[in-house]
Amino acid sequence: MRLNKMTGRVIATMGIAAMMMTQTAGVMAAEQTENKQLKVVYYNQADYPGKKIGGSTIQAAGCGPTAVAVCYSSLTGKKADVPKMCKQAYKHGWYYTGQGCSHSVVPGLSKLYGMECKGLGMDKDAVEKALRAGHPVVALMGPGDFTKNGHFVVLTRMVGKDKVKIADVGSRARTAETWSLKKVIRQGKEGANAG
């Protein structure tokens, strides 16, 4: 797929029945045509008070579409309409009342916005390689530092040998920190019902 004469790939943790993925969890990736450090455009779920996604709010349950918005704007330089992306997630069945967005929101919205997804699995080396090539990596996190249940974040770049910067669409404080890539991979959520 082409996106403004640029192919984009978004990476997100995936499970069963997604984009030629196996039954084990994976990470979906989005590519650029050039290998360079990604200039990150940040969106936060709290910036849309009262805006809805299904029966909830973007602030409470819109992390998946907001993470895709970070990738879209970072890859294209265009402003994303986060509330519109959330409405599309609901319309296409990627949002489940009381549970949030499913793992399929990332490849689904990516396709709608002209980005091509590629599965990476939970392979630390593959994630590191994608980040060093300037590709954003969307990860669905499980219980730990980022969430009690499930939460999408965007890994944006490597820092040194084994640290990573993350655009956490639910926390500016966590976005300002640098994280161990091993720790992030360990906290990634596996399974098709993640998120």
Predicted regions span which residues?
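Active-site-adjacent structural segments surrounding the nucleophilic cysteine of cysteine proteases
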Residues: M6-R9, T24-Y95
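Conserved active-site-adjacent core of cysteine acyl-enzyme catalytic domains
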Residues: N35, Y72-G195
